[in-house]
Amino acid sequence: MFKRGGIYAVNLAHSETSSQESCPCLVVSNNISNEYSSVVTIIPLSMVNLDRIYDFECFLPAAKSGLGVDAKISSHIIITIDKSSVVGERLGFLNKGLMEQVEKTLRLQLALE
């Protein structure tokens, strides 16, 4: 089962947001939905332009994400995908502190505050 805060490789070949075949993505949908729905909501991770982190982005240090490389999420790219697009096992998992930072960027992007 997919868990909120988990990082998974996702096949985004059919997505308008990516030209690469698979990309590590962070699950942001709630765990009840993740368990019972056929879809999951994700944010793709980027490993480029890490020298500048905007307010709608969140830096994910390798040591705290389990990825082995630094990355960032951009909360303006939120995608709901079919679970069959996920390829392989979980790559990493964000701790509570990092998820709180991600949630802050989501609230900003979605004007929830």
Label the model's feature ranges.
Residues 63-113:
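C-terminal terminal-subdomain/extension
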Residues 13-17:
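Short, charged beta-turn/beta-strand-edge "cap" motif at the junction between a beta-strand
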Residues 18-22, 27-63:
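Compact nucleic-acid interaction/catalytic patches
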